[in-house]
Amino acid sequence: MASYYEILDVPRSASADDIKKAYRRKALQWHPDKNPDNKEFAEKKFKEVAEAYEVLSDKHKREIYDRYGREGLTGTGTGPSRAEAGSGGPGFTFTFRSPEEVFREFFGSGDPFAELFDDLGPFSELQNRGSRHSGPFFTFSSSFPGHSDFSSSSFSFSPGAGAFRSVSTSTTFVQGRRITTRRIMENGQERVEVEEDGQLKSVTINGVPDDLALGLELSRREQQPSVTSRSGGTQVQQTPASCPLDSDLSEDEDLQLAMAYSLSEMEAAGKKPAGGREAQHRRQGRPKAQHQDPGLGGTQEGARGEATKRSPSPEEKASRCLIL
């Protein structure tokens, strides 16, 4: 294990303020919620940082550490006497607190990750996007040349009576692919969702892949757009598409009425519809039959005659169809 000064990246002559600034920077850097993809290593570093700060921030403990090292505090080696170590019974050893307790004591009830924006320069305005107990955190890495890697994380803390909830979302762009990891810690349970280019790829609960949770989440996401599509499709189907068919039917009815009218006119004039051999003879003898329409009083000649200039009426067309 490296020395406490190396862990906090400060010289041995660092002042108390230097120790505090170093702990703030390192604790936020290695907080497990900030490193969901490298949890075990982050937890180890987070614990070392808390231990180093707990010793170097205390003047008496720092003196013991400078003289005897870490063994002088744990009692595993040649260390100070009971009087030097402070009050305690025989065999006194220093007991380190949990890193989470040190973290909460240092930052209090405020937003711990908001502290980073003091040193982010032009990005400090992004702090306003978070609420009192939440705030975004951004990190940038090399993007030159041909390699694009950007990650962002947002944290939400809900401290309460023994309850702690943390939501972390990180997005990384690597070689044109977008990898998004969402990690939720609540009531001692960890849920991690991993997306690639917007497609959910995996869901793990407490480090164990959960296919059932993955299927339920995929189904929930697919239901939302399908409901919208179905509601929109109903309106499209209401567009009337039968108008051309209705128009054709109306034209057929008009033609039938015209034909019936012509037949009645011919019967009233004492003529019979052409048919049988007489009709065949007339069709073979001349291209077009000549007939007189008593209703209109006009004549029509065949192809050899001289055609009239006016256009035939619907009744005349119907009569011509019957004759032919």
UniProtKB/Swiss-Prot annotation:
Q: Which residues form the UIM domain?
A: 210-226, 250-269
Annotated Pfam families: DnaJ
Task: List residues, modification Phosphoserine.
Answer: 311
Tissue specificity note: More abundantly expressed in neocortex, cerebellum, spinal cord and retina where it is expressed by neuronal cells (at protein level). Detected at much lower level in non-neuronal tissues including kidney, lung, heart, skeletal muscle, spleen and testis (at protein level). Isoform 1 is more abundant in neocortex and cerebellum compared to isoform 2 (at protein level).
Q: Indicate the impact reported for residue 219 to A.
A: Loss of interaction with polyubiquitin chains, loss of interaction with PSMA3, and loss of the ability to protect ATXN3 from proteasomal degradation
The UniProt record lists the keyword Flavoprotein: no
Q: Where is the J domain?
A: 2-71
Query: Where are the compositionally biased (Basic residues) regions?
Result: 280-289
Lipid group attachment sites (S-geranylgeranyl cysteine): 321
Mark the residues carrying the PTM Cysteine methyl ester.
Answer: 321
Which disorder does the record name?
Answer: Neuronopathy, distal hereditary motor, autosomal recessive 5: A form of distal hereditary motor neuronopathy, a heterogeneous group of neuromuscular disorders caused by selective degeneration of motor neurons in the anterior horn of the spinal cord, without sensory deficit in the posterior horn. The overall clinical picture consists of a classical distal muscular atrophy syndrome in the legs without clinical sensory loss. The disease starts with weakness and wasting of distal muscles of the anterior tibial and peroneal compartments of the legs.
User: What does the entry note on its domains?
Assistant: The J domain is sufficient to interact with HSP70 (HSPA1A or HSPA1B) and activate its ATPase activity. The J domain is also required for the HSP70-mediated and ubiquitin-dependent proteasomal degradation of proteins like ATXN3. The J domain is required to reduce PRKN cytoplasmic aggregation. The UIM domains mediate interaction with ubiquitinated chaperone clients and with the proteasome. The UIM domains may have an opposite activity to the J domain, binding ubiquitinated proteins and protecting them from HSP70-mediated proteasomal degradation. The UIM domains are not required to reduce PRKN cytoplasmic aggregation.
**This protein's name:** DnaJ homolog subfamily B member 2
Q: Which organism is it from?
A: Homo sapiens
UniProt lineage: Eukaryota, Metazoa, Chordata, Craniata, Vertebrata
Whichever gene encodes this chain, its name is DNAJB2
